């Protein structure tokens, strides 16, 4: 969006005079004081400026907003006055509604913002002049300048008003091959997208895309309008597909994402094409179409490798691992997750590292490889401690504790199954002290790798008892 410089304008006579008495005071002045001040001003002007007309005297008395309106009417800009007056009424209505909802409403009244009033006067009157001359491109440019000026959070509704005006005027411009119409569709798409009306946004972005196909048009920053159309359309399609997937409308989501993928290929942007493949692959995964999901995600993997984009490659490995895990192919899933862990570690992506380590720990835990599961969960937990993320810390702490309990369960079960006096003594000793428990040296060779010392386990359990969440319970 264009950032406009300060406006070098020649002000009408009344507003030029009125400007000299700014800034306006927001305090309410008693009527008696106003009458006295009016008399004082009249006397002062009569003594010192005998040549002033009544209109010039009125410029000092009236508000800046009123002088702007008077100048518009005096100069014959009746349409500009009507539009400005309607905007001022809406401005006051919105301020009043916001004041009722919040005691901290800081938006100033329009009469206390002379710069905005100047912009209104300058561009609205120029647009009206251009409209009289049937120069619709100049009308568009002046209205668009106002939209750019009011592109801030508190005035976005004003920006949207001028976007809509630009859209109507753009339909009348026939000399530029449809460029202004394409830009107007882009702005209307943004308007609806920000308002959450995705279907309406998609309609405008589709028209924007159609008008820019085969064109070399660029925006004010030098970016291709066709590429912007592709990006906007893909973003909207993805948001629409997310809603469809939430409602389990898998076929519709896949259909719209296939369309997005085709548009991405037209844009000749490999990164954008890869993103489209990624979301399409996830949609196939949600629909349990695993083979198709693997094929599409493999395309994303190849594009990420070609672009030397490690972070995208990590996302591809994660998604492929989820598909393989859903198929029950945990061995291959582990391979891809290890690659994901390596990329996350090398690129200092802590959240990705936590997620990958947790996924690996879950798989190892399900397979009964409790030592490996415990190691992965511990890595995830240690990383969340560094991140100081309490929700993640609590989640990984639970995973870690479960894996350590499973480790201990193997040793305890073996002692119980032995049913001899020595094993019973070990169990009773541990039960009393909750300290170390050692495997029976006689039966250890038969237990193999499944029998472990729990001295390390108990240390970890004590460590878990010192976690932040448990300290509250002790107190």
From Swiss-Prot:
Keywords associated with the record: Cell projection, Cilium, Cytoplasm, Cytoskeleton, Flagellum, Repeat, TPR repeat
Main subcellular location: cytoplasm
PROSITE patterns xref list: TPR, TPR_REGION
Region (Disordered): 436-475
Keyword hit for Transcription: no
SUPFAM superfamilies listed in its UniProt record: TPR-like
Biased composition (Basic and acidic residues): 459-475
GO term, biological process aspect, one: cilium movement
InterPro entries reported for this sequence: Bac_ResReg_Asp_Phosphatase (IPR051476), TPR-like_helical_dom_sf (IPR011990), TPR_rpt (IPR019734)
TPR repeat boundaries on the chain: 92-131, 136-173, 182-215, 234-267, 274-307, 314-347, 354-387
The UniProt record lists the keyword Cytoplasm: yes
Pfam families: TPR_12
Transmembrane domains' residue ranges: none
Subcellular location: Cytoplasm, Cytoskeleton, Flagellum axoneme
GO CC terms of this entry: cytoplasm; cytoskeleton; sperm flagellum
Comment on protein domains: The TPR repeats are required for axonemal localization and flagellar beating.
Role played: Axonemal protein which is implicated in axonemal and/or peri-axonemal structure assembly and regulates flagellum assembly and beating and therefore sperm motility.
Name recorded for this polypeptide: Tetratricopeptide repeat protein 29
Organism: Macaca fascicularis
């Amino acid at each position: 969006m264009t950032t406009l410089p300060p406006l070098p304008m020649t002000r009408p006579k009344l507003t030029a005079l009125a400007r000299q008495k700014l800034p306006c005071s927001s305090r309410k002045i008693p009527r008696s004081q106003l009458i006295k001040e009016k008399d004082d001003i009249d006397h002062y002007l009569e003594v010192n400026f005998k040549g002033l007309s009544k209109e010039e005297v009125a410029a000092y008395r009236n508000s800046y907003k009123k002088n702007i309106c008077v100048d518009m009417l005096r100069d014959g800009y009746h349409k500009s006055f009507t539009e400005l007056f309607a905007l001022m009424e809406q401005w006051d209505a919105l301020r009043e509604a916001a004041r009722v909802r919040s005691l901290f409403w800081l938006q100033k009244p329009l009469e206390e913002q002379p710069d905005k009033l100047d912009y209104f006067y300058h561009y609205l009157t120029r647009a009206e002049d251009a409209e009289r001359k049937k120069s619709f491109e100049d009308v568009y440019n002046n209205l668009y300048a106002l939209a750019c000026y009011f592109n801030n959070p508190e005035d976005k509704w004003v920006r949207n008003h001028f976007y809509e005006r630009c859209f109507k005027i753009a339909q009348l411009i026939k000399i530029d091959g449809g460029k202004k119409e394409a830009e107007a569709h882009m702005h209307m798409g943004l308007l609806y997208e920000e308002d959450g009306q995705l279907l309406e946004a998609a309609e405008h972005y589709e028209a924007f895309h159609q008008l820019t196909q085969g064109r070399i048009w660029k925006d004010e920053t030098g970016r291709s309008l066709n590429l912007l159309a592709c990006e906007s359309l893909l973003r909207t399609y993805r948001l629409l597909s997310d809603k469809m997937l939430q409602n389990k409308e898998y076929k519709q989501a896949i259909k719209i994402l296939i369309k997005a993928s085709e548009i991405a290929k037209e844009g000749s942007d490999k990164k954008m094409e890869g993103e489209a493949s990624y979301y399409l692959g996830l949609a196939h995964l949600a629909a349990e179409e695993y083979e198709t999901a693997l094929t599409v995600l493999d395309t994303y993997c190849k594009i990420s490798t070609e672009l030397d984009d490690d972070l995208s490659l990590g996302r591809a490995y994660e998604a492929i691992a989820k598909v393989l895990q859903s198929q029950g192919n945990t061995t291959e899933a582990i391979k891809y997750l290890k690659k994901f862990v390596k990329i996350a570690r090398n690129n200092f992506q802590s959240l990705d590292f936590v997620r990958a380590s947790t996924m690996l720990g879950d798989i190892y835990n399900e397979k009964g490889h409790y030592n490996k599961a415990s190691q992965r969960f511990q890595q995830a937990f240690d990383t969340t401690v560094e991140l100081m993320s309490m929700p993640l810390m609590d989640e990984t702490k639970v995973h870690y504790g479960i894996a350590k309990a499973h480790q201990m369960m193997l040793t305890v079960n073996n002692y119980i199954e032995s049913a001899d006096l020595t094993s019973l003594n070990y169990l009773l000793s541990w039960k009393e002290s909750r300290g170390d428990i050692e495997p029976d040296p006689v039966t250890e060779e038969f237990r193999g790798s499944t029998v472990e010392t729990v001295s390390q386990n108990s240390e970890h359990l004590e460590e878990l008892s010192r976690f932040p969440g448990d300290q509250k319970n002790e107190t």
